[in-house]
A protein has these predicted regions:
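An alpha-helical support segment within catalytic cores of ATP-dependent transferases
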Residues: 8-25, 130-180, 184, 242, ...
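A general structural signal marking secondary-structure boundaries and capping sites
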Residues: 21, 82, 125-133, 169, ...
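Short, surface-exposed acidic
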Residues: 23-29, 235-245
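ATP-binding pocket architecture of kinase catalytic cores
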Residues: 31-137
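Active-site acidic catalytic loop and adjacent metal/ATP-binding pocket
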Residues: 34-46, 50-54, 165-207
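Start-of-helix signal in alpha-solenoid helical-repeat scaffolds, especially tetratricopeptide repeats
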Residues: 68, 247-251
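Active-site activation/catalytic loop segments of kinase-like enzymes and analogous catalytic loops
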Residues: 206-236, 250-268
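ATP/Mg2+ or Mg2+-diphosphate-binding catalytic cores
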Residues: 258-284
Length: 284
């Protein structure tokens, strides 16, 4: 009985989601996809045979430091730059987005050759940096402090772990449009198309590149190849002192740790615990 009740609730939730779409999309049916760590994702199939991608964002974006209005602003610009899939319907207040369907796999499932990845991502960054700089800023110190303040329980080991980093001084000399989550799951095909712009804001490009290195499992040489390819495409260095990305590696680890702690409080599970353990180890 419990299984039937759960299935009925799921069907009702999907019907309610379809009802929020304008015609003709509400006449379709939904197929749940493997969701990310924060969103619910679906393939929307229409009677015509066409498909679309439907994303329902996290219900508490403020807790995760997400600004929906800025996400939508950057997304619209990214479509114009050929970075993001065309959007047919959006409700920034709830994080609902209906996009073109893309059959190309993400880089987790089918990564391009490793030697090509730095240049491909340099192309993403050069186009991204042509967009207007958002008014909302994601500065690493303030962003991490917001995450920490929202923790219901601070682990006993955290104060000693974070002390050295918080006593340091991070670069704060360049602010550009940033995606802030260019991990392999958010890159589709060889173009690549970039999805999940939730954490988009003005940010330091060095943090963006440091985040790429960590989430792609790169060595320093691949990060340096990306930076060199960027300078060649852009016709010069970024900012007055370059990317300075090495200085942001511990900030990527720290923010990743706090994010995973926040998510684990809300929904404990092995995926979040693995991220906690990994980032804690990197900071030790």
């Amino acid at each position: 009985m419990a299984g039937k009740s759960s299935e009925a609730s799921l069907v009702a939730a999907e019907r309610a989601l379809l009802a929020r779409l304008p015609p003709p999309w509400r006449s379709g049916w939904l197929e749940p996809l493997a969701s990310g760590l924060t969103n619910c994702n679906y393939r929307l199939r229409l009677p015509s045979g066409r498909s679309h991608f439907l994303r329902q964002g996290h219900p508490d974006p403020v807790r995760l430091g997400i600004d929906r209005a800025t996400e939508w602003q950057l997304y619209q610009g990214a479509v114009g730059q050929g970075l993001a899939l065309p959007c047919h319907h959006s409700d920034p207040a709830t994080g609902l987005m209906l996009l073109d369907w893309c059959d190309e796999p993400n880089w987790l499932a089918a990564p391009p050759p490793a030697a090509l990845q730095p240049a491909l991502l340099a192309g993403v960054l050069t186009r991204l940096h042509r967009l207007p700089v958002p008014s909302v800023v994601m500065a690493v110190r303030a962003h991490s402090a917001g995450y920490r303040a929202r923790l219901a329980r601070v682990p006993a080991w955290l104060p000693a772990l974070e002390r050295g980093l918080l006593a340091s001084r991070e670069p704060a000399d360049c602010w550009l449009p940033c995606h802030h989550d260019l991990n392999p799951a958010n890159l589709l095909g060889s173009r690549p198309w970039v999805i999940d712009w939730e954490y988009g804001a003005a940010g330091h490009p060095g943090f963006e590149v440091a985040s790429i290195q960590r989430t792609h499992g790169w060595q320093d040489a691949q990060r340096e190849a990306l930076e060199q390819a960027y300078c060649e495409r852009a016709g010069g260095p970024v900012g007055p002192r370059g990317f300075q990305s090495r200085a942001f590696l511990p900030w990527v680890d720290y923010i990743g740790l706090l994010w995973a702690l926040l998510m684990a409080e809300q929904q404990p599970g092995p995926d979040y615990q693995a991220l906690i353990d990994l980032n804690r180890q990197r900071l030790e």
